[in-house]
């Protein structure tokens, strides 16, 4: 698929995915106006919002009005609909389970130095070890944000970026979300992708920057079109956000990456793809955590809005006779002064069988229990689809201080299973991205790549909950008593965040302390049989 040259935008073959991205983006953002726009304009492509009268009356063309957000509010009344940010919570928790504690990058086992205590220790870290340490500090925020958006949209992409003006000594990873990419796969592998960015909207005019990635090469194009059309290609120098590229590209508006593969790594949220399993261009995309539960999001908002309406309608009100009202002047109506002590005589009879009270109190009931139970039931179904535990969202109360693994491990087994599935994909993505970044740095002769041999690092994910120190200590004690683990293994278990140097020093201290407590050995030559 070469660089697009015009026509519909996004291209027709990507329409199913982009319609879904539009909906998932609206739920993720949680803006009521955006949700109303999406569900009052159900089409394959985004376009200018409009309101159809049939949406107010129902009917065939008003099917979307069955959604809470599919019926526009009346222009002469306050919008009673409220949104609960459950979709945003799902995406955030998904990312927190993976990357709340940053992953660590280390040399593969076959590349690590020997752990023989008698072997000489290296004076300093090797260049590749130092580069991995730097990346461990550089990428955690990128991964955390990427995982959150991937949970909402079904995936994201990591690309290796070289900008010698911003970062003269090294390349860095950047992220492109699924709704800014047009990928092409073969046998489940990404073979090319076009990233696009909307640079400017001026009335009907839309300026888009396209970035087409193929193995070893990136081509750029600036297009002047509309919201529905890509339009004509114009020079990169015609927009301030693209003019810097004009100094980098060759005669074909592209540049070489220096490596033979794509400078992009796709990052699917989870698989398999259910919605587009038989659609050629979308079958290899990741699956969103929102997929299939959009009606439940809408139902939760409907029940919550109904609850709030009950509160509004349940406000205490009073009905007073006309004689209690005082005129506010010609054409300005009348009002009642609740602080007034003396009123004129009443030209009315008291209520039959009631007290001689001319004020009637109106107070409607508020269905608290019914609404709460319905919201809870819908919330449980929302969590069931992407496979999360209620305890992960603090549904049983939050205790003071960090929660230990012993306290919540059994209750959150479902969430941990989902985390492990996502971690399998994320681990491969990180390994591929780091190796690709090192290869680009070496090919581009950047200072950070000198002396660094590209490799796939070992990636270790942090614990999503705090390990229980007592349980860890008891486990280590049992292993030691059973002679089932070495001192080094026990130190690594108790201190999983320590590096190799810290572990070596601790092992030496323990062995020295153990040796100091041992009784001295007797000299065998001093033994006498007749003693």
Regions found by a protein language model. Give the residues of each.
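Extended, helix-rich architectural segments
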Residues: 1-201, 521-531
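Extended, non-catalytic structural segments that build the interaction scaffolds
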Residues: 44, 48-51, 349-385, 402-428, ...
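Extended, regular secondary-structure scaffolds
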Residues: 144-285
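Extended, charged amphipathic alpha-helical segments
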Residues: 244-410, 447, 460
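Short, surface-exposed acidic
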Residues: 390-395, 447-454, 495-508
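A glycine-biased, small/acidic residue-tolerant capping/turn segment at secondary-structure junctions
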Residues: 432-459, 504
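Long, highly charged low-complexity segments enriched in Glu/Asp and Lys/Arg with interspersed Ser/Thr
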Residues: 493-525
